[in-house]
């Protein structure tokens, strides 16, 4: 039998050579132009070797694995269009999944038996690499390739004194990846998620068409793709809004022993989005008692002395958890003289435990790239490439205290997780409901992230235990059972019915958009939303032709 790699290449080559290598180029205002791509050039970019397929069979989660038949390394977006059109030329199309840095946790970027597109190869011409990030200072935007890392977008924009407005906590992930989900962070209460800060996209659809879209042109595709989980197209370029960049940050954490003032103060802070009196960034963390008394003795923010004081607070108050609001106040040379006074005035409005306010002064880049430094520490300790059974939820404000009581004081009461638990509110009116991303039906909702790791020999429990706890949390949240009514962020559902409940009233629209832009369901199969259609039935035998068993 021919080895799998050789067989795959042979079948693809022979089938591809039978197609016409004629592609559609980007659609601008409905005008089509032609673009020829050599079939042999496309074939040379499909890698079926063990190293390539093995890397593409795992992700940051290290929980599920699925091997593709090949990895495609495109030089241009038109190469991706050619690959998709090749798939569509087959009686049974192969699936295609774009992969950035592989930071998904449940195989969302997998293509079992199909082709994974290594987006990082875009712009790589062998002898040189095109830097696919261009800043318009006059019009205050940056054009960034879908494969570009946010950390590189940051550094490029800062050369012009500009910055995007909203950041995920971790910056070494791709533009296309976060925009396919939403892209949330501590600035989202003020500016919405990253998808609310996009002016224009270049997209390769599941039909192999290269289309430029915006809220005004090809708007159905634009709104479908943003938060669309890769179901309608591959983002190859995004035009992202910029603003003047600050130079430094007052980085603050304030502690609470009770969830009620913690949530009240967070909601007060995000209500100040239209004024200049509040924080520019608001997030929050939940630290379970056992992680203080039995966890590490220092962190990238807290000193050993700080953690000892926080441990004492937990013991003295008998709290199951200590809650932190994390805030950031940006400033530059013009506001440096007044920032401390502004911060003090804001803190006076809040009801944290007096004496438990911690302030650091950091550069803007140091603050934004804080998780990058933590990554280096975890890699050095061998604690980065481990299973990450993460669970991210959006919880309605009306149910957040119930969630806290049932989860942090119930399901996880005796847990000692390795990792973080995030909890912070956002304003729903900063989201655009025309986009595919889903949020609860309340004006304010909380992002809750159980960002836990299964570290070998650690005290956080094994993967199975963490998964059981996640399942209990999801059961609590399940809408079908009359639960809290959460929505998953970076969602994973094991059934079609689960996806129907996830999208709710949007399900019909999502299904219609799928039929329009990816009718053969070849894109991003790892999400498990739309199964590919079955292969066509063979034609009946001609009259007099013997019927043979297959």
Swiss-Prot record:
Biased segments, Pro residues type: 530-543
Binding-site positions, FAD: 100-102, 104, 108, 169, 174, 180, 184, 235, 489, 524, 527
Domain of life: Eukaryota
Modified residues (Pros-8alpha-FAD histidine): 103
Entry GO terms, CC: extracellular region
One GO-annotated biological process of the protein: cytokinin metabolic process
InterPro entries, per the entry: Cytok_DH_C_sf (IPR016170), Cytokinin_DH_FAD/cytokin-bd (IPR015345), FAD-bd_PCMH (IPR016166), FAD-bd_PCMH-like_sf (IPR036318), FAD-bd_PCMH_sub1 (IPR016167), FAD-bd_PCMH_sub2 (IPR016169), FAD-linked_Oxase-like_C (IPR016164), FAD-linked_Oxidoreductases_BP (IPR050432)
Pfam families: Cytokin-bind, FAD_binding_4
Major subcellular site: secreted
Gene3D superfamilies (alphabetical): 3.30.465.10, FAD-linked oxidases, C-terminal domain, Uridine Diphospho-n-acetylenolpyruvylglucosamine Reductase, domain 2
Required co-factors: FAD
Keywords: FAD, Flavoprotein, Glycoprotein, Oxidoreductase, Secreted, Signal
Signal peptide extent: 1-26
Domain FAD-binding PCMH-type, first and last residues per copy: 64-245
Enzyme Commission no: 1.5.99.12
Parts forming coiled coils: none
Glycan-modified residues: 289
Region called Disordered, residue ranges: 523-550
Alphabetical list of PANTHER family matching this protein: CYTOKININ DEHYDROGENASE 10 (PTHR13878:SF65), GULONOLACTONE OXIDASE (PTHR13878)
Function: Catalyzes the oxidation of cytokinins, a family of N(6)-substituted adenine derivatives that are plant hormones, where the substituent is an isopentenyl group.
Subunit structure, as described in the record: Monomer.
Family according to the record: Belongs to the oxygen-dependent FAD-linked oxidoreductase family.
Protein name according to UniProt: Cytokinin dehydrogenase 10
Organism: Oryza sativa subsp. japonica (Rice)
Taxonomic lineage from the root: Eukaryota, Viridiplantae, Streptophyta, Embryophyta, Tracheophyta
């Amino acid at each position: 039998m021919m080895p799998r790699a050789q067989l795959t290449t042979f079948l693809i080559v022979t089938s591809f050579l039978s197609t016409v290598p004629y592609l559609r180029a980007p659609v601008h205002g409905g005008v089509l132009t032609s673009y020829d791509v050599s079939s042999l050039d496309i074939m040379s970019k499909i890698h079926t070797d063990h190293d390539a397929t093995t890397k593409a069979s795992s992700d940051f989660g290290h929980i599920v694995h699925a091997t593709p038949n090949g990895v495609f390394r495109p030089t241009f977006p038109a190469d991706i269009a050619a690959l998709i059109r090749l798939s569509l030329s087959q009686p049974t199309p192969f699936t295609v999944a774009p992969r950035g840095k592989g930071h998904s946790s449940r195989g969302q970027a997998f293509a079992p038996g199909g082709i994974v597109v290594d987006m990082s190869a875009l712009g790589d011409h062998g002898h040189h690499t095109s830097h696919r990030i261009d800043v318009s200072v006059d019009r205050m935007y940056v054009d960034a390739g879908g494969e570009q890392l946010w950390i590189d977008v940051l550094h490029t924009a800062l050369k012009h004194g500009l910055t995007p407005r909203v950041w995920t906590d971790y910056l070494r992930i791709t533009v296309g990846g976060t925009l396919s989900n939403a892209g949330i962070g501590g600035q989202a209460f003020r500016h919405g998620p990253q998808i609310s800060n996009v002016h224009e996209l270049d997209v390769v659809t599941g039909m192999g068409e290269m289309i430029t879209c915006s809220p005004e042109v090809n708007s159905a595709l634009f709104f479908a793709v943003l938060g669309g989980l890769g179901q309608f197209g591959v983002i190859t370029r995004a035009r992202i809004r910029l603003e003047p960049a600050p130079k430094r940050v007052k980085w603050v954490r304030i502690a609470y022993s009770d969830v009620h003032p913690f949530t009240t103060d967070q909601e007060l802070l995000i209500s100040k989005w239209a004024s200049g009196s509040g924080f520019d960034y608001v997030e929050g963390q939940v630290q379970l008692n056992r992680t203080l008394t039995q966890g590490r003795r220092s962190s990238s923010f807290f000193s050993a002395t700080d953690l000892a004081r926080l441990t004492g607070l937990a013991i003295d108050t008998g709290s199951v958890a200590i809650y932190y609001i994390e805030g950031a106040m940006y400033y530059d040379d013009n506001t440096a003289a007044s920032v401390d006074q502004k911060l003090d005035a804001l803190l006076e409005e809040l009801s944290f435990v007096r004496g438990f306010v911690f302030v650091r002064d950091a550069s803007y880049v140091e603050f934004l790239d804080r998780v990058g430094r933590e990554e280096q520490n975890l890699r050095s300790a061998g604690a980065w490439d481990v299973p990450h059974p993460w669970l991210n939820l959006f919880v309605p404000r009306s149910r957040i205290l119930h969630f806290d009581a049932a989860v942090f004081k119930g399901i996880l009461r005796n847990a000692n997780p390795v990792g973080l638990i995030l909890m912070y509110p956002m304003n729903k009116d900063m989201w655009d409901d025309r986009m595919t991303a889903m949020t609860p039906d309340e004006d304010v909702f909380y992002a809750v992230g159980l960002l836990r790791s299964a570290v070998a020999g650690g005290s956080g429990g094994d993967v199975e235990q963490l998964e059981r706890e996640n399942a209990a949390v999801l059961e609590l949240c399940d809408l079908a059972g009359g639960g809290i009514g959460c929505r998953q962020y970076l969602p994973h559902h094991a059934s079609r019915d689960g996806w129907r409940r996830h999208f709710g009233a949007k399900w019909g629209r999502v299904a219609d958009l799928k039929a329009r832009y990816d009718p053969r369901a070849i894109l991003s199969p790892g999400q498990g939303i739309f199964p590919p259609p079955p292969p066509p039935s063979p034609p009946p035998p001609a009259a007099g032709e013997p019927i043979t068993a297959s």
